[in-house]
Design a protein with these regions (language model features):
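Tandem CBS (Cystathionine beta-synthase) repeat/Bateman regulatory domains
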Residues: 2-179
Length: 179
């Protein structure tokens, strides 16, 4: 459905309702991709990989390699205690000349974890990750970890929504769009 509003905004809504088209002051069309963390988790899954603070960094790096992820949550007594990433390993172990086999996760993990709820928008998450220079966001509701999203997950989401929007626009223009 194509509608207009006072700000010369046109919204093209289709089953996923993941895009809005805006016309700027010069009449140039701009596509805004929308969506929530919940949408990403439904698509990617909510499997969470973690380590305990008392495991060695070597064990954490092995697990990251085994699961093909760049970060692991650190769980202690069933609660989120921190996050450890490849970046933590590089900066706090390799560059300091430490051994990953004798250094514990609790010594290098990031304890102050930035997290979001599943209702946060993709845009809000991208902004939060960019401002804080982080690559992974735990998704938490009522102190329960629901999943983790990476900047790569957000980029994949945006690209897929752009492709879907282009397809719908092409169908709309060619009159093949359902009314």
């Amino acid at each position: 459905m194509l509608t207009s509003g006072p700000a010369r905004a046109y919204f093209l809504l289709y089953p996923s309702q993941a895009a809005a088209i805006f016309l700027d002051r010069s009449g140039q069309a701009m596509i805004k991709i929308t969506g929530t963390v919940d949408s990403i988790l439904k698509r990617k899954g909510s499997e969470v990989w973690f380590v305990s603070p008392d495991q060695t960094v070597y064990e954490a790096i092995e697990r990251m390699a085994d699961k093909a992820v760049g970060a692991l949550l650190v769980i202690s007594d069933g609660k989120l205690a921190g996050i450890i990433s490849e970046r933590d390993y590089a900066r706090k172990v390799i560059l300091k000349g430490r051994s990953s086999k004798t250094t514990f996760v609790k010594e290098i993990m990031t304890s102050t974890v930035i997290s979001v709820t599943s209702s946060k928008s993709v845009d809000e998450c991208m902004d939060l990750m960019t401002r804080n220079r982080i690559r992974h966001l735990p998704i938490i509701e009522s102190e329960k970890v629901l999943g983790v999203i990476s900047i790569g997950d957000l980029v994949k989401w945006v690209i897929s929504q752009q492709e879907e929007t282009i397809e719908h626009l092409q169908n709309y223009i060619s009159s093949a769009y359902p009314t």
